[in-house]
Amino acid sequence: MAGTPHIMIVESRYYEEIAQHLIDSVLKELSDAGARYERFEVPGAFEIPAAIGFALEASKLESNATAYDGFIGLGCVVRGQTTHYDYVCGESARGLQDLALKYSAAIGYGILTVENRDQALARARRDGFSWNCDSFDDA
């Protein structure tokens, strides 16, 4: 990639406090890397792959569509009392992996899958998002 990387961030802010910790660490990493970014919000983690997929498909089909060098999906899924958690976690991960393979796209997976709010906060507050930004070094 030549020049300044342009990153699409797709975030679910369903759990506002957790989402804020995640985006703060991502924006710090992108700022440190000198990257440009655009943020898009979706209702939940399940919708993150679709939003990224729409952008990838648009850039392939439309000459005036915004082209991104990489993508970051951010969200949090907390286990509840039904199987909904399993479906959302599995399908959001599978959806992003399928997109990465189909389009040879650099996609950072920043969707926390946790048992409870305390665990989510502990993971969201940890050492930033650097654990997931290495994929953009080679984008």
Language-model regions: role of each:
Residues 2-39:
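Glycine-rich phosphate/diphosphate-binding loop of Rossmann-like nucleotide-binding domains
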Residues 13-14, 42, 75-77, 112-117:
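Short, ordered loop/turn segments at secondary-structure junctions
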Residues 39, 68-74, 106-113:
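Short beta-strand segments at enzyme active-site cores
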Residues 85, 90-139:
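C-terminal binding/interaction regions
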